[in-house]
Design a protein with these regions (language model features):
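Gly/Ser/Thr-rich phosphate-binding loop
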Residues: 281-285, 295-357, 367, 371
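AMP-binding/adenylate-forming catalytic core of the ANL superfamily
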Residues: 109-119, 126-130, 284, 394, ...
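Conserved AMP-binding/adenylate-forming core of the ANL superfamily
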Residues: 21-32, 40-85, 89-93, 110-115, ...
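Conserved AMP-binding/adenylation subdomain of ANL enzymes
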Residues: 216-233, 243-282, 297
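AMP-binding/adenylate-forming catalytic domain of the ANL superfamily
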Residues: 156-157, 507-529, 548-549
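Conserved structural elements of the adenylate-forming
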Residues: 57-62, 189, 194, 208-229, ...
Length: 549
């Protein structure tokens, strides 16, 4: 077991095994069985490339052997920052064959985030494209390797400069090693299969260990409530590093059933609608902001989208009007809302739930042994129908962040329930309704941004005396960030200058404020904290005056 990982208590592990939730098989062994069973079926389509399950397994095996040649070993951590291309699947499953632990970084992460992941995890390698959207990832990895001696390997998809390994060459190169060597590697199903990421409210990223046992079960249960089967075809358009497109049911859930996954490295309607028509896509997972963009694109009426059966929507609450308009434009589809978190617990509206229930709720847990508590500020369970903080425990919900004992003491109850920070109410149907959140996060199009992280950076600006970042409503993204700033005497600051300053700190683009409010003072709570409710109310009133709300 990797040091710093919090195991499930033995009594719970025994229960989950006895009930058949945990099969004590690694993702490597699960994938090997899938590849043998569905060998001739197409697994992935990436633009004009079609790859069968057998071909995917063969290339992942060859890559795994070559990664062993380059010095990677079981339990080594590897930062994976690849776009939605077939090489992602080759690399992901190659790491599983070795027993390495991928760290699922987003393409938008920059030096600040990636260097933190490397430091927290002790990562041995990092893989990324050479360039994407005018950003040079080779320069990023070179800087991080210079700062962190544990990062031994830089692997590049595309043009690999001197000192880097070419991912394409590693996939194609024959190894002198035997594939049997991979089978001899012992993988503990209770070890992490991967690390998902959680920004949290402190701004310091945390690593979420998802074990082989819990992540296989996660994918199977998500597939069971989304009508996945061998004849279904998924369009994966959200970044594969996210939990939803990877395993809820995502790529893993469709593979388990021998389905087909079409990868898209764009979200534009002009690219997506032809893909749906050409490949007869049955399932797609989105965030509300993306769905809103699609249904407002005039091109949507020019393509045959009648193959679509399920649109999963997650990350934010979907407004009933958007659901109604989607159904009007694509009568064949059921919009299935879900609530999930990389930490584990998933809630899905069931496809056969009553229309009123689907309109009002985000679903209910997918496992019979998922445990939910709604509690008040003193951890007392609230009365039925009342709002409380959502606490979760179950066979695929983590028991602790990696290497974070002090934070874990605050993030979990003494009996192992995870404190989500989300406020919920139980619907009479048994499903749940999201009512807000306790944690200081801004939800921009499904990406959760720590207000504290951005505030700490803004406070380093020489013109800033104090700052509070708050969400402002947005019809498409749900929320955008507004920075409320008190300036130092005699100083001035404009939004473009603030954005440029933050960009120099090399944080992800989605964390940049999109509105700046200069204020004389902040209302303080009785405990001396800035009243963010007062700020959001003041800005909401201003937006109404401007006709923007």
């Amino acid at each position: 077991m990797l040091e710093g990982v919090v195991r499930f208590p033995q009594e719970f592990a025994a229960r989950y095994r006895a009930k058949g939730y945990w099969e004590d098989r690694s993702l490597r062994d699960t994938f090997a069985e899938i590849s043998a069973r569905y060998s001739d079926r197409v697994a992935i389509i990436d633009r004009d490339r079609e790859v069968t399950y057998a071909e995917l397994d063969e290339r992942a095996t060859r890559l795994a052997l070559n990664l062993l040649d380059e010095g990677l070993r079981p339990l080594d951590r590897v930062v994976v920052q690849l776009p939605n291309v077939v090489e992602f699947a080759y690399f992901y499953f190659a790491l599983q064959k070795i027993g390495c632990i991928p760290i699922m970084a987003l393409p938008t992460h920059r030096y600040r985030e990636i260097s933190q992941f490397v430091e927290l995890s002790g990562a041995a390698a990092c893989v990324a494209p050479d360039r994407a959207r005018d950003f040079d990832y080779t320069k990023l990895i070179r800087r991080i390797r210079n700062a962190h001696t544990n990062l031994r390997l830089g692997i590049i998809l595309g043009a690999a400069p001197k000192g880097f390994l070419s991912l394409t060459e590693l996939i194609e190169r024959k190894s002198v090693r035997s594939a049997d060597e991979l089978k001899s590697i012992t993988i503990d199903p209770e070890d992490p299969a991967l690390f998902q990421l959680s920004g949290g409210t402190t701004g310091v990223p945390k690593l979420i260990p998802r074990t082989h046992n819990d992540y296989v079960y996660n994918s199977k249960m998500a597939a069971s409530v989304t009508s996945v089967g061998p004849d279904k075809i998924l369009l994966d358009v959200l970044p594969l590093a996210h939990n939803l497109p990877l395993a809820c049911p995502g790529l893993q859930g469709f593979f388990i059933h021998g389905g087909k996954v079409v990868l898209a490295n764009t979200t534009r309607g002009e690219d997506i609608f032809p893909l749906i028509e050409r490949h007869r896509i049955t399932h797609v997972a989105v965030v509300p902001a993306l769905l809103i963009r699609w249904i407002n694109d005039p091109l949507i009426k020019k393509f045959d989208l009648s193959s679509l059966q399920v649109i999963q929507s997650g990350g934010q609450r979907l407004q009933p009007e958007i659901r109604r308009r989607t159904k009007e434009l694509i009568p064949s589809v059921t919009v299935q809302e879900n609530f999930g978190m990389a930490e584990g617990m998933l809630m899905f509206v069931r496809l056969d739930d009553a229309e009123a229930v689907r309109m009002e709720t985000v679903g209910r847990p997918i496992s019979p042994d998922d445990e939910v508590r709604l509690v008040d500020d003193d951890d007392n369970e609230v009365a039925p129908g009342e709002v409380g903080e959502f606490l979760a425990r179950g066979p695929y919900t983590l028991r602790g962040y990696y290497g974070a004992p002090e934070y874990n003491a605050r993030a979990f109850t003494t009996d192992g329930f995870y404190r989500s920070g989300d406020l919920m109410r139980q619907h009479p149907s048994g499903n749940y309704m999201v009512e807000g959140r306790k944690k200081d996060l801004i939800n921009r199009g499904g990406e959760k941004i720590s207000a504290e992280e951005v505030e700490n950076l803004i406070l380093t600006h020489p013109a800033v005396q104090n700052v509070a970042c708050v969400p402002i409503p947005d019809a498409v993204l749900g929320e955008r960030m507004c920075a409320c700033v008190i300036l130092r005497k005699g100083r001035s600051l404009a939004l473009p200058d603030l954005v440029a300053f933050l960009a120099e700190q090399e944080i992800a683009k989605h964390k940049l404020p999109e509105r700046l409010e200069i204020m004389d003072d902040f209302l303080l709570s009785p405990f001396g904290k800035v009243s963010k409710k007062d700020l959001t109310d003041r800005i909401a009133n201003k937006l109404k005056e401007e006709g923007k709300l």
